[in-house]
Amino acid sequence: VALKERNESITIGLVDPCGASMEAYFNKGTAEASAGTSIIEGIGVNHVTDNVAQARVDQAYTIDDTEALPYAFDLLRHEGLCLGGTSGINIAGAVRLAEHLGPGHTIVTILCDYGNRYQSKLFNPVFLENKGLPIPEWLAI
């Protein structure tokens, strides 16, 4: 709400993992869970909280794990940033928003979780393989 109060032309985006409902709430008006599931923890509520009800979201996207995880893996390999799946989802959403808006826009997102919390899933090649998720070559068995 505060961003829009300061600049009405700001575009606010929201990302949700598969199986969550906020994307549907902002795009369809009902908080119905999307198809699928996600291994990414700590994101994707299935009820509308007061702060969400007041949000002025312009673009909402559902991001699946196969789209999000490569961003988290690339940031670790190329930038030395060990981030979690929520950060990967946020980056994937920022990329989608950038594609939607086109050139000449500034996109800001939040990288909000450390990857070391998810070692048993995010950095476990056996787990990723069992879930049919991408495994970076540097993590392969």
Residue spans of the language-model regions?
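Short glycine/serine/threonine-rich phosphate/pyrophosphate-binding segments
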Residues: 1, 22, 86-94
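Surface-exposed amphipathic alpha-helices with a cationic face
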Residues: 1-7, 98
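Active-site/ligand-binding loops adjacent to catalytic centers
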Residues: 5-85, 122-141
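Phosphate-binding loop/pocket of nucleotide- and phosphate-handling active sites
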Residues: 37, 92-141
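A short, small-residue-rich loop immediately preceding and capping a beta-strand
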Residues: 81-87, 108-111
